[in-house]
Regions:
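N-terminal pre-P-loop "Q-motif" helix
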Residues: 184-203
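Accessory nucleic-acid engagement/destabilization modules that flank
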Residues: 1-167
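Hydrophobic positions on the alpha1 helix immediately C-terminal to the Walker A/P-loop
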Residues: 224
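Walker A (P-loop) phosphate-binding loop of P-loop NTPases
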Residues: 218
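Conserved adenine-nucleotide phosphate-binding loops and their immediately adjacent elements
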Residues: 166-189
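Hydrophobic anchor at the beta1->P-loop junction of P-loop NTPases
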Residues: 213
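Conserved lysine of the Walker
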Residues: 221
Length: 236
């Protein structure tokens, strides 16, 4: 999937045609279902940027990217050779705690690229822009700073974003890397999370018995087993 111009995408007045246009611009393999509030928030963001900078049309973002297998999604990512800007879009009121949790998690995933990361959230219903500080605090942000971050010198990444983020980069072995495991510096794939939920439900329902799962080598079976053990310990 390629980056696109949100300025170009938000010029279209009909949401019925947005999905088709987005696919043409990004080269996405499958059509993306864009909800009305998402489109509205993106249009509001573009309008705000136009008030503070001249060349909004030149900004390139990866829109609604989801890391394969992990199911982790980002609303807007500007990726350059020397820094990353992440902007999350919200339409309704959301707590600073929830915003902070999401942006910190996003930063962890993005850190594999080993570049400085600037993290923002825009709440369109309040016309509120916030950012995550280097000390992991949520503070109100000004548009001038966001525009400055977006216009920093650097070369836009023009390749497919899937080539930068692979699930195996986030899978660790609790046996060979116990410190990272104990610090929970890992994330399970969506399939692993589903398996864990089912097994824990069965354990609580039946209280005894044998529970198992299988998979080919390299799919994170050991990590899942250890995570289930930790989760069960915490819940009992």
């Amino acid at each position: 999937m390629k980056s696109l111009s949100i300025y170009t995408l938000t010029r279209n007045q009909s949401i019925e045609h947005i999905s088709k246009l987005e696919r043409q611009l990004s080269g996405r393999k499958f059509p993306l279902k864009i909800r009305t509030w998402e489109w509205g928030s993106m249009r509001a963001l573009a309008a705000q940027l136009e008030m503070y900078m001249q060349e909004v049309y030149s900004l390139r973002f990866f829109y609604s990217f989801q890391i394969p297998r992990l199911g982790k999604e980002f609303d807007l990512l500007q990726i350059k050779d020397n820094h990353i800007v992440n902007i999350e879009l919200k339409s309704g009121v959301v707590s600073d705690q929830a915003i902070r949790k999401q942006l910190i998690q996003n930063r962890y995933y993005l850190s594999v690229l080993e570049r400085p990361i600037q993290s923002y959230t825009y709440i369109s219903s309040q016309n509120r822009l916030v950012r995550l500080t280097h000390h992991d605090h949520i503070v109100d942000a000004d548009w001038e700073r966001l525009c400055e971050d977006l216009q920093k010198e650097g070369t836009n990444y023009e390749g497919n974003i899937e080539d930068l983020f692979r699930a195996e980069l986030y899978l660790i072995s609790p046996i060979t890397d116990p410190v990272r495991f104990l610090k929970k510096e890992y994330f399970l794939t969506s399939q692993q999370r589903d398996i864990e939920k089912k097994i824990l439900r069965d354990i609580y329902a039946k209280r005894s018995g044998c529970f198992w799962f299988s998979g080919i080598p390299g799919t994170g079976k050991t990590l899942l087993l250890y995570d289930i053990a930790v989760s069960y310990t915490h819940l009992t």
